[in-house]
Amino acid sequence: MNDLHSEVIVAGIGQTPVGEFWDLSIRNLAARAILDAIKDAGGVKPQAMYIGNMLAPSASKQANLGSLLVEDVGLTGLEGITVEAADASGGAALRAAYLAVLSGRVDAALAVGGEK
């Protein structure tokens, strides 16, 4: 376990355009944003990923996004956790990533919010 961190920063961001992408799945869209965020962060490899989502199990018939997206973007070996908090799911994922870094449990965490 690492020491407590006194400062947590956002090292990179990634976002897909807002729109109706009927030909892309939520996994495709989220993977694009994840890879862009990692690139923007200079290639820093996260040690944990938190995915904020509430509708995928019902709207896209796709549960367990966290573990699936870890594999989709080639980050196998780290935990991928889906966080659900209704309209605040993305914010809850960001908070979980922040607390993971602040606590010293990981040095880098990835927070993702996505709906389709």
Question: Where do the language-model regions lie?
Answer:
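Conserved phosphate-binding catalytic cores of ATP/NTP-utilizing and phosphoryl-transfer enzymes
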Residues: 91-99
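Active-site nucleophile and cofactor-binding loops and adjacent substrate-binding regions
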Residues: 80-90
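Conserved "HGTGT" condensation-loop signature of ketosynthase/thiolase-family condensing enzymes
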Residues: 1-80, 99-103, 110-116
